């Protein structure tokens, strides 16, 4: 698999490419299946439909890897939190965590056993996927998941989380530790079900100041990665902490690929990290609105990463109103322009 070879810094015939949120709303085929499922969470829980939408970008765009269709918040859902998706405001937890008693009500022993719909979707997708295409499993970082569990929804300033961080750091560490243990088992089951690689999404990394990022986020991601790498050395682990271009000097540990977001200068990440890790990224997602902007972005990134281990991706998820034709153009352009 070209994608796995690139993760491990092996030579590849061209630069492999996939897109975050590639199974998503910009595809009419996805919207059709989502409509059949009824709502977003029902789609996540219907393993046949989740597998179908995971495979759509392979069939339509010919990307080099599929990522399983799911959501980072199915983990706290199966730990016993009350999750719903509100139109216009995204995920909402009806019972956010603010005390140790709230945390102790959550089931960390059996949560990973209740996520069979994810493992079944992985098994089915791996069966249907061509042998040369990789299948990526994933989870959210403990910190990013915790922000939703504590805030009760998405947040502009993470005030409840940060209040806990400064007033009661022991409680926040207990929440993060509990999540970390569940996520280790969850990812292990994903690997057993057929995932060829794992990505940990730390979408809200940039909400933390420098030292606190390493204490409350990065160290927990490393604990998960160390667990995976010790048991499954042939499974690459990708970390994607978004928005931390100022923190790159301290990024170190046992993982394989570092995801670079679009706000981080790629040459900066290359100079600081490419001797240790394959870099993944980092085209500005809005470039996909315009073919000239796509061409300019692709050329610049390929030039920056010339002779370095690289997986092409967007620097965040593809947006819902991107024309499919532009996405196809983008994928093909990367694969053809980077061909050795």
From Swiss-Prot:
GO terms for molecular function: uroporphyrinogen decarboxylase activity. Substrate binds at residues 21-25, 40, 71, 148, 203, 316. It is an enzyme of class 4 (lyase). Pfam families: URO-D. Its EC number is 4.1.1.37. The record marks 71 as: Transition state stabilizer. GO terms for cellular component: cytosol. Pathway: Porphyrin-containing compound metabolism; protoporphyrin-IX biosynthesis; coproporphyrinogen-III from 5-aminolevulinate: step 4/4. Keywords: Cytoplasm, Decarboxylase, Lyase, Porphyrin biosynthesis. It catalyses: uroporphyrinogen III + 4 H(+) = coproporphyrinogen III + 4 CO2. It is found in: Cytoplasm. One of its GO terms (biological process) is protoporphyrinogen IX biosynthetic process from glutamate. Belongs to the uroporphyrinogen decarboxylase family. Catalyzes the decarboxylation of four acetate groups of uroporphyrinogen-III to yield coproporphyrinogen-III. PANTHER family: METHYLTETRAHYDROFOLATE:HOMOCYSTEINE METHYLTRANSFERASE RELATED, UROPORPHYRINOGEN DECARBOXYLASE. Homodimer. This is Uroporphyrinogen decarboxylase.
């Amino acid at each position: 698999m070209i994608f796995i070879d690139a993760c491990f810094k092996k030579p590849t015939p061209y630069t492999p490419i996939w897109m975050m949120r590639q199974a998503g709303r910009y595809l009419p085929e996805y919207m059709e299946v989502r409509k059949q499922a009824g709502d977003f969470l029902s789609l996540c829980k219907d393993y046949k439909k989740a597998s179908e939408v995971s495979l759509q970008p392979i069939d339509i765009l010919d990307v080099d890897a599929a990522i399983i269709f799911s959501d980072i918040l199915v983990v706290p859902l199966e730990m016993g939190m009350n999750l719903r998706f509100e139109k216009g405001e995204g995920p909402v937890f009806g019972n956010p965590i603010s005390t140790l008693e709230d945390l102790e009500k959550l089931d960390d022993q059996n949560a990973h056993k209740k996520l069979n719909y994810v493992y079944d979707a992985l098994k089915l997708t791996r069966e249907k996927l061509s042998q040369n295409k990789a299948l990526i499993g994933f989870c959210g970082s403990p910190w990013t998941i915790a922000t939703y569990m504590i805030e009760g929804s998405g947040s502009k300033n993470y005030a409840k989380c940060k209040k806990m961080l400064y007033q009661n750091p022991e409680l926040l560490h207990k929440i993060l530790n509990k999540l970390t243990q569940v996520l280790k088992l969850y990812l292990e089951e994903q690997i057993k079900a057929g995932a060829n690689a794992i990505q940990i999404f730390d979408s809200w990394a940039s909400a933390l100041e420098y030292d606190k990022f390493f204490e409350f986020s990065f160290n927990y991601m490393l604990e998960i990665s160390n667990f995976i790498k010790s048991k499954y050395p042939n499974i690459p682990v990708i970390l994607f902490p978004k928005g931390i271009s100022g923190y790159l000097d301290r990024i170190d540990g046992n993982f394989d690929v570092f995801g670079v977001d679009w706000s981080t200068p790629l040459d900066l990440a290359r100079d600081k990290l490419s001797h240790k890790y394959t870099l993944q990224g980092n085209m500005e997602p809005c470039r996909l609105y315009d073919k000239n902007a796509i061409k300019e972005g692709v050329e610049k990134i390929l030039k920056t990463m010339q002779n370095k281990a690289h997986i092409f991706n967007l620097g965040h998820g593809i947006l819902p109103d991107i024309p499919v034709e532009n996405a196809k153009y983008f994928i093909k352009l990367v694969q053809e322009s980077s061909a050795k």
